[in-house]
Amino acid sequence: MSIIDNRKASHDYFIEDRYEAGLVLQGWEVKSIRAGRVQLKESYVIVRDGELFLLGMHVSPLPTASTHIHPDAMRTRKLLLKAEEIHKLIGKVEQRGFTLVPLNLHYKNGRVKLDFALGRGKKLYDKRDTSREKDWLRERERVMKHDTRRRSD
C-alpha cells in the first residue's frame, strides 16, 4: 500500500531501474508518515561516504509531538540497502546523466520503505514528446471506444 507517490519523477526523468530501501526514522517521523503528513516532491537521493541518504523529504511533525524533542522536518535520512546494491548504484550514479530519484513511500511488513529509481533527466523536448504521445494514446482510445459503440448499435 503506497503512502505517497512522487508523480513528478516520471515527468522529469526516464526511469531505468527501480530499487527498494529501508529508512532510518525517528519515532515522531513514523507517526507523522502514518498520518500522511509527508512530501516527496522536492526530495532526492545522494551518495555520501559510500552510503545513500535521502534529502528534501518533508515530514511535518504532529501537534502531539513530544516537547523535549525538537523535530527537524527536513533532516537527512539514511537509506538501508545491502552493500552490494550500494556499490552497484554508486558505479551507475558516477556515470554522466544518472541520478537517484525517490518514487514512493510504502509499507512492507509494517515497516516504511522507499522506492527509488535510477533515472536520466529529461530535456524539455523529451517532456513535450512524452506529453504529445500520451495525448495521442488518450485520443486513440477515445476514438476506438466511440467507434466500437457505433458498430455494436
Curated annotation (Swiss-Prot):
Subcellular location(s) of the protein: Cytoplasm
GO terms of biological process kind: trans-translation
Keyword vocabulary terms for this entry: Cytoplasm, RNA-binding
Source domain of life: Bacteria
Annotated InterPro entries: SmpB, SsrA-bd_prot, SsrA-bd_prot_CS
Parts forming coiled coils: none
GO MF, any single term: RNA binding
A GO cellular component annotation in the UniProt record: cytosol
Predominant place of localization: cytoplasm
Record HAMAP family: SmpB (MF_00023)
Family: Belongs to the SmpB family.
UniProt name for this protein: SsrA-binding protein
Gene designation per UniProt: smpB
